[in-house]
Amino acid sequence: MAQISLTFPDGNAREFPAGITPAEVAASISTSLGKKAISASVDGRHYDLQWPIEADAKIAIHTMADEAQALELIRHDLAHIMARAVQELWPDVKVTIGPVVANGWYYDFDREETFTPEDLGAIEKRMKEIINARDAVRTETWDRDRAIAHYEARGENFKVELVQAIPADQQIRMYWHGNWQDLCRGPHLQHTGQVPADAFQLMSVAGAYWRGDSNNKQLQRIYGVAFKTRDELKAYLHMLEEAAKRDHRKLGKEMELFHLQEEAPGMVFWHPNGWQIYRTLEDYMRGRLRKAGYKEIRTPQVVDRKLWEASGHWEAYKENMFLVEVEEEHAKEKRINALKPMNCPCHVQVYNQGLKSYRDLPLRLAEFGSCHRYESSGSMHGLMRVRGFVQDDAHIFCTEDQIEGECAAFIELLSSVYKDLGFDSFEIKLSTRPEVRIGSDEAWDKVETALENAIKKVGAAYEIDPGEGAFYGPKLDFKLTDAIGRKWQCGTFQVDPNLPTRLGAEYIGEDGAKHRPYMLHRAILGSFERFIGILIENYAGKLPFWLAPRQVVVASIVSDADPYVAEVVAALRARGVRAEADTRNEKINYKVREHSVGKVPVILAIGMQEVEGRTVSVRRLGETGTESAPLDQVVERLATDARIPG
């Protein structure tokens, strides 16, 4: 029998018979590992313990201690277990697909009756019975004709369609536990009992079109979440409860920040309070960019399709663009314009005006650019996913040798901005060259090394995401962590030699010849709308004083104090504090409650005692008790707190 060489993570290699499975490899190392093994990585591919290995490879055996692989398998197995439970409870239900998603999985079903909360309870109960039965998981490979015949005999038309889309010469993998089977790429655990029975929960039912196409049949999608332990599940459910309390849509209404309506789907109506947050954040970012050497520009929102065709975006983004047809005078045909879905091609147009020298580089062009993208109605979610948004967009035109320095400076700027906004921790992911790409390996080596060196230079932690870069260059993604532990991907840094080439950007080098600049796409917030939503939820509406839309309410206790209330408001406003008077004929406790719901950071209560002593009674949001202090002292303190940082 032919032999193959398997290399382990420690660098040691061993000879094995060709066709050996990872399960057999694990057992050959130790009885203990053979029992604990759940899957393997073979040349970087997640591999089922039952699959044969036919050639030399690098191998790593995974156990439940390997978080990423364990959770993927648990969630994948639960998708199958749920589908089996549904078909055992309601045999007429047809199954479709059930992938792993963030924190869990979903599965789409074709059923005439709507799944109810009681149905979800019954499904969960049956799932736990399947898990406790410890049914063995087995797998076979079939040819396409056999799989089609199998599913046609069972009336599983969705599965037939999936199989028909697979090339005729490709083997199809089938998985079983008990008498139930499904078409699946795998991998899976070895028996259903390896899934923790007390660490999952079915969450909700939603509508979903087959293959995401609204012209197809609408199915029912059941979502579930799963973790390795009961405690992790409880922590996640607690986080969801906290998230519901912090929902920016709920707080946005209470704080009178914004609204959305059917006549303008995905477009935000900013109210005075919300617009104040927006403008303050914009002023802050403008100041930070100016100090970092960026030049602010403004480019058109409506641009002819010719530019999008030249940039390559027409082919890739046309379906997500808002198009406008215009009949120009004396023109033979209508002009087709698009509301810009991104700013980068327009920034190249600004760069291209006038001859550039290497001495002009790096050139950093920034824009708070208004963009529009068509998002499906089902994907929109408050401020987090909209159709009209503004990016804190900037593009750096530079030489290859300048990439590392520009990247390091950007990471330091991003880190400082996030800290100012209350986010002390973030993750960096470096996405490297994909299989299909342009450019030489030497060029990719240089830019990937430049990004990695930049990260190391600033002392930041990072992970490498192999093969996930764009076809033209590597990128960095930045995920911040909010107050309840959620991750939000906001910042990006993308190296792009492609767009300058497509749109003719050039500079004169030291050698007197023309060269193409690199274009570095970068953003810190991502979009103002989404980031404001994140801020609202991170702070549960209790924004930092400098960012709060209504910073101070000066509330009278008696009407005789009204003139002094007006004086206090005027003194605060003169020092740049956003202050309002509340002289309504209401009890002070009522006023305090109302403004606390509106998340006003500071309430100054004014009665006759304060008038006579020229003091104010200070109440801070979320704190019990009050502090009495001289007016001048309080004005000075609040004026300092109101200053925009940076």
UniProtKB/Swiss-Prot annotation:
<dbReference type="InterPro" id="IPR012676">
    <property type="entry name" value="TGS-like"/>
</dbReference>
<feature type="binding site">
    <location>
        <position position="521"/>
    </location>
    <ligand>
        <name>Zn(2+)</name>
    </ligand>
</feature>
<dbReference type="Pfam" id="PF00587">
    <property type="entry name" value="tRNA-synt_2b"/>
</dbReference>
<comment type="similarity">
    <text>Belongs to the class-II aminoacyl-tRNA synthetase family.</text>
</comment>
<feature type="binding site">
    <location>
        <position position="344"/>
    </location>
    <ligand>
        <name>Zn(2+)</name>
    </ligand>
</feature>
<dbReference type="GO" id="GO:0005737">
    <property type="term" value="C:cytoplasm"/>
</dbReference>
<dbReference type="InterPro" id="IPR002320">
    <property type="entry name" value="Thr-tRNA-ligase_IIa"/>
</dbReference>
<keyword id="KW-0030">Aminoacyl-tRNA synthetase</keyword>
<keyword id="KW-0648">Protein biosynthesis</keyword>
<keyword id="KW-0547">Nucleotide-binding</keyword>
<keyword id="KW-0820">tRNA-binding</keyword>
<dbReference type="InterPro" id="IPR006195">
    <property type="entry name" value="aa-tRNA-synth_II"/>
</dbReference>
<protein>
    <recommendedName>
        <fullName>Threonine--tRNA ligase</fullName>
        <ecNumber>6.1.1.3</ecNumber>
    </recommendedName>
</protein>
<dbReference type="GO" id="GO:0006435">
    <property type="term" value="P:threonyl-tRNA aminoacylation"/>
</dbReference>
<dbReference type="Pfam" id="PF02824">
    <property type="entry name" value="TGS"/>
</dbReference>
<dbReference type="InterPro" id="IPR018163">
    <property type="entry name" value="Thr/Ala-tRNA-synth_IIc_edit"/>
</dbReference>
<dbReference type="GO" id="GO:0046872">
    <property type="term" value="F:metal ion binding"/>
</dbReference>
<dbReference type="GO" id="GO:0004829">
    <property type="term" value="F:threonine-tRNA ligase activity"/>
</dbReference>
<dbReference type="InterPro" id="IPR012947">
    <property type="entry name" value="tRNA_SAD"/>
</dbReference>
<dbReference type="InterPro" id="IPR033728">
    <property type="entry name" value="ThrRS_core"/>
</dbReference>
<dbReference type="InterPro" id="IPR045864">
    <property type="entry name" value="aa-tRNA-synth_II/BPL/LPL"/>
</dbReference>
<comment type="function">
    <text>Catalyzes the attachment of threonine to tRNA(Thr) in a two-step reaction: L-threonine is first activated by ATP to form Thr-AMP and then transferred to the acceptor end of tRNA(Thr). Also edits incorrectly charged L-seryl-tRNA(Thr).</text>
</comment>
<dbReference type="InterPro" id="IPR004095">
    <property type="entry name" value="TGS"/>
</dbReference>
<dbReference type="GO" id="GO:0000049">
    <property type="term" value="F:tRNA binding"/>
</dbReference>
<feature type="region of interest" description="Catalytic">
    <location>
        <begin position="247"/>
        <end position="544"/>
    </location>
</feature>
<dbReference type="InterPro" id="IPR012675">
    <property type="entry name" value="Beta-grasp_dom_sf"/>
</dbReference>
<dbReference type="GO" id="GO:0005524">
    <property type="term" value="F:ATP binding"/>
</dbReference>
<dbReference type="InterPro" id="IPR047246">
    <property type="entry name" value="ThrRS_anticodon"/>
</dbReference>
<comment type="subunit">
    <text>Homodimer.</text>
</comment>
<dbReference type="InterPro" id="IPR002314">
    <property type="entry name" value="aa-tRNA-synt_IIb"/>
</dbReference>
<keyword id="KW-0436">Ligase</keyword>
<keyword id="KW-0862">Zinc</keyword>
<keyword id="KW-0067">ATP-binding</keyword>
<dbReference type="Pfam" id="PF03129">
    <property type="entry name" value="HGTP_anticodon"/>
</dbReference>
<keyword id="KW-0479">Metal-binding</keyword>
<dbReference type="Pfam" id="PF07973">
    <property type="entry name" value="tRNA_SAD"/>
</dbReference>
<feature type="domain" description="TGS">
    <location>
        <begin position="1"/>
        <end position="63"/>
    </location>
</feature>
<dbReference type="InterPro" id="IPR004154">
    <property type="entry name" value="Anticodon-bd"/>
</dbReference>
<keyword id="KW-0694">RNA-binding</keyword>
<keyword id="KW-0963">Cytoplasm</keyword>
<dbReference type="InterPro" id="IPR036621">
    <property type="entry name" value="Anticodon-bd_dom_sf"/>
</dbReference>
<feature type="binding site">
    <location>
        <position position="395"/>
    </location>
    <ligand>
        <name>Zn(2+)</name>
    </ligand>
</feature>
